[in-house]
Amino acid sequence: TLTAYSNSKSGQQLRVCSDKRGESTTTIASADLADFLGNWVEVEEKARFGEDGSYEVTIMRVKDGKVLLKLDPQKMDMWRTDCTGLRPKWGIYRYLGENRSWQDQLRDEEIRFADFSIKKL
């Protein structure tokens, strides 16, 4: 999961997390979210789906070519047992907190996609 995250200890960051059913989420890469705000970024993401899968991602700021986040290929289980298909999602997803307790902290956000492509390799 690629997630924008905020807490009092680490501030705002973009995290790449590995999530195994029944286990806690582990952050495997992170970057300061401030570097992303108001900027176009180019993302190259490669995923091999399967129980013996892998994941890698590079995010580069377009205006100066600075790499903001890079995760080298990681072996990981990229398939849930008994699943019959794959449903990738791109967009803004929010957790409102228990009983909507964080709702007042949310602000309007916008995400724009350009030159979007998906390839089966």
PLM features: what roles do these ranges have?
Residues 37, 42-76:
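Carbohydrate-binding surfaces in secreted/extracellular proteins
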